[in-house]
Design a protein with these regions (language model features):
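Membrane-embedded alpha-helical bundles that constitute the cytochrome b-like, heme-associated redox core
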Residues: 1-135
Length: 135
């Protein structure tokens, strides 16, 4: 049950990441009317917290459950879970490397958000709609 809520928190923080990332790149200035230094700070901390929320979930999924292929949902979840920290590593590499085209970082960030959304949809959303919604 804790995994569902941690995954949901990570997804909410990923949405914050997408919104603030778009604001940093000059988009959504009216939607996110926060000055640039604060947007940078919110972007960094929401990313750190999102990854922090994924760690207990990943630990449980990797070491207790492992890679599974029982049905299409579980297979999609296992594949997305296999990619999530690899995509994170690529994103962190491009954050610190300035010798890349300007479009690369938003693409990698969007890929990270898509992978987290896939993980959430194939786990927490499924749990909320098929098992139960509650604490």
């Amino acid at each position: 049950m804790f995994k569902v809520w941690f995954a949901t928190a990570a997804l909410v923080l990923a949405v914050v990441q997408v919104m603030t990332g778009a604001r940093i790149f000059g988009k959504l200035e009216r939607v996110v009317p926060i000055p640039r230094p604060q947007v940078n700070r919110v972007h960094r901390w929401s990313g750190r917290l999102a990854i922090l929320c994924t760690l207990p979930v990943a630990f449980h999924c990797i070491f207790i459950l492992g890679f599974q292929t029982t049905n299409a949902r579980v297979l999609a979840h296992s594949i997305a879970g296999s990619f999530v920290y690899g995509v994170l590593a690529v994103k962190l590499f491009f954050v610190h490397d300035r010798a890349h085209p300007r479009w690369v970082l938003p693409v990698v960030g969007g890929t990270m958000a898509a992978v987290l959304t896939t993980l959430w949809a194939t786990s927490a959303l499924w749990y909320f709609t098929n098992v139960r919604f509650g604490f």
